[in-house]
């Protein structure tokens, strides 16, 4: 499993808005892969333009269920051993991103359910990021939020 970049670095708020409206949902959540991919992309961008002030926007159901490396556990969401390991990997990567100090972040949780499986707040806290739930924002609200950064 791997992460997919839906929006490469851009200054175009309009492009971001269009992509947000067509955001696919469902399936597995390889969150640690997503954080690593976003971090690498952002660092690469900073090497090209050290004066820029990028904002890493993580839009996810924030229910990580795919480990960094495959293990023998079948369903990571409900496995007593595998699931805590997945969460530990995600939070460790989030803390690493925060420790770098160069990258501002936002975490937007798109799953409307909020229970013990919801890790958006924990991920945002570990990243030093602002946290939002999608039902509290609409596309226009997200765009306003990004413009205010």
Language-model region placement:
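Short beta-strand-loop
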Residues: 1-22, 42-47, 68-71, 116-123, ...
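Amphipathic alpha-helical segments in well-structured domains
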Residues: 13, 17, 35, 87-90
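Short helix-terminating capping/connector loops at secondary-structure junctions
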Residues: 48-53
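Von Willebrand factor
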Residues: 1-9, 34-37, 41, 54-59, ...
